[in-house]
Amino acid sequence: MVKQVDPFYQQIARTIAQEGRQILCIAAEAKLSAFYYTIGNSLRGAPELLLIGNFEEKPTMKILNKLSEMMLETGRAFSNGQRVNPFGGEHDMQVWNTTPIAKLQYTAQVGEFLASLDSVTGVPKDYTVQQVVLPDPKGRYPADKRCHKRYRVPVLRPTADLMADMRSTLVH
C-alpha cells in the first residue's frame, strides 16, 4: 500500500493491509445514533458497508467483517434489498443501496482516504455504499411502525426505490 502522510490515514492503510479493511465506529451524539462503516472494500471493487444504530461494538464489527468477506468471495455487491443471514440467526439482515447522503454524512473518511491515495497512485476517488439494516428481535425493520425504537434507524435508500416499493404494495 502507498505511504500516507497523515498519521490517521497511515494507521488505516496499515489496518487495510493486514485485515483487508478498517471499520470505524462513530459514537452517538445528541439525537444521532452511533454508526459503523468499512474503509477498504472499495479498493477491491466492492461497496463500503454502513450500519447505523446504537449497538455493541464487537458484534457490529463482526457483522460488517463477515458481510464484507461474503461480498469479496462472490466478487459482487449485494443486490439492492437483499436479505442475508451470515450467522444463521432467527432473522435476516437487509442490505440496501444508499443515496449520496451516506457518503456526505456517514462515510466521509472513506472519500478522504481514497482521495489521499488518488493523489499518489491514481486509485479512483469514487466509491459506493450499501447500508446493512438489522431487524428488531421480533424480525421487524425500521419501516414497520411496530419496530422496536432501538432498531428504528434512518434507512438511506434512494427515493426512487422507496416509491417503487410503495407502488408494489398498493398493487398487491
What are these regions (language model features)?
Residues 1-29, 43-46, 54-172:
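Acidic, proline/glycine-rich low-complexity IDRs
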Residues 32-43:
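A glycine-rich, hydrophobic loop/mini-helix early in the fold
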